[in-house]
A protein has these predicted regions:
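Short hydrophobic transmembrane-like helices used for membrane targeting/insertion
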Residues: 1, 5-9, 353, 363-366, ...
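Conserved SAM-binding loop
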Residues: 14, 22-32, 108-251, 256, ...
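Conserved SAM-binding loop and adjacent beta-strand
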Residues: 95-111
């Protein structure tokens, strides 16, 4: 898809407690058509800042009038987006408890690949967005021949298995190579998700699996509670959108798991949202979202403890009650299949994309056998 660079300037102003001392900065954005259906007709869903790094920069999330895909529009282009991924964004926590969490999560992720794992003979896995390589190493220990894709500098640290250090859609391999391809919390970050789905179809062997996790745009958490990591999250998908992407790419949906088994997506601020929209009959904007307890402590320079807890209760009684309601709200969401994130398992069709397709971006020649840094 051809993208038009517009000279749109991001809105720049302070947002409540997130207002910082940083000077206003002009950000050149691009306006794009829907990546799924090509329509340029859309409506605004919400506006919110980059709460993580640049709280004075606001972005707009829109929904396509034709297919319902959600996306940031206008958005930072491929060059501009780099400033929103500083080096420390890729730093992982180092603690025994976090290591245990990763092992538990990787075990759950591996279950989605059991069908392939139980087949006789060697099996090859490509993990897209492999970060520092921990999940591929986990799978290698289970007997898989692993490779990864990671465009950040962290990929340079990986020496024990092959890594593609460029966009997944741009790697030069075109023939069916892998028994499984995984993308955990990746497809919401990319500028051209259709190219990623198509590339997965090209590289999968017949009957191979594409397993991916992403936010659920049909959920209150994603759509209404301002917990998406904008502008790093660029796209927001419903299950209908996923089915359409898979159809275009020659993949068939096998199942969706909407239970939050890989990444949790807690409905924080659900009660304040319900009070505002159902009782007060008013719109719930980003400025209406209470600070989290962590944000509140940081703002007021408080240590975690009873004093901080009481002050937070006085600041937002609804938020304190909200936290206690999460388990019940999540249980209902899971029953209704409206939890904040979903994991999908798709299979390659017998007849799918065969030609070597690349987007307009520059392609660098590489092969998994070349090892790290390619």
């Amino acid at each position: 898809m051809t993208l038009s660079i517009t000279g749109v300037i991001a809105q720049s102003f302070c947002a409540g407690a997130f207002c910082g001392p940083k000077a206003k900065e002009q950000v050149i954005l691009e306006t794009v058509a829907c990546n799924l259906c090509g329509s340029r007709r859309y409506k605004t869903v919400y506006e919110m800042p980059d709460a993580r790094l640049f709280p004075d920069e606001y972005f707009t999330v829109v929904e396509c009038d034709e297919c319902g895909l959600g996306f940031v529009n206008p958005r930072p282009d491929r060059q501009e987006i780099q400033k929103y991924y500083p080096r420390d964004y890729y730093e992982n926590e180092e603690s025994a408890s976090f290591a245990r969490y990763l092992q538990k999560r990787f075990t759950q992720q591996a279950r989605y690949l059991k069908e392939v794992e139980d087949r006789p003979g060697p099996r090859k896995l490509l993990d897209v967005g492999c970060f520092n390589g921990e999940f591929p190493r986990f799978m290698a220990a289970r007997g898989w021949d692993v490779s990864g894709v990671e465009i950040s500098e962290v990929s340079q640290r990986i020496k024990d298995f092959p890594v593609f250090s460029q966009e997944f859609s741009e790697i030069s391999i075109c023939e069916p190579t892998y028994d499984a391809i995984t993308a955990w919390a990746v497809l919401e970050h990319v500028h051209d998700p259709l190219a990623y789905f198509q590339k997965a179809s090209q590289l999968l062997k017949k009957g191979g699996l594409f397993v991916f996790q992403m936010p659920n745009f049909a959920s209150t958490t994603s759509r209404c509670l301002f917990w998406e990591d904008v502008p790093r999250h660029l796209y927001f998908y419903t299950r209908e959108n996923v089915a359409q992407y898979l159809e275009k790419a020659g993949l068939v949906l096998q199942r969706e798991d909407n239970r939050g088994n890989v990444y949790k997506s807690s409905p924080a601020s659900w009660l304040p949202y319900m009070i505002r929209t159902r009782l007060q009959r008013k719109a719930f904007t980003y400025k209406d979202k209470p600070l989290s307890s962590r944000e509140f402590r940081k703002l007021h320079h408080l240590q975690r403890g009873i004093t901080a807890g009481l002050k937070y209760l006085a600041y937002s009684p609804a938020s304190a009650v909200d936290r206690m309601l999460w388990p019940a709200v999540e249980a209902v969401q899971i029953l209704r299949k409206t939890y904040g994130s979903s994991t999908y398992v798709a299979r390659k069709r017998a007849l799918a994309i065969a030609e070597c397709w690349h987007p307009a971006a520059k392609v660098r020649t590489m092969s998994p056998s070349q090892g790290n840094g390619i």
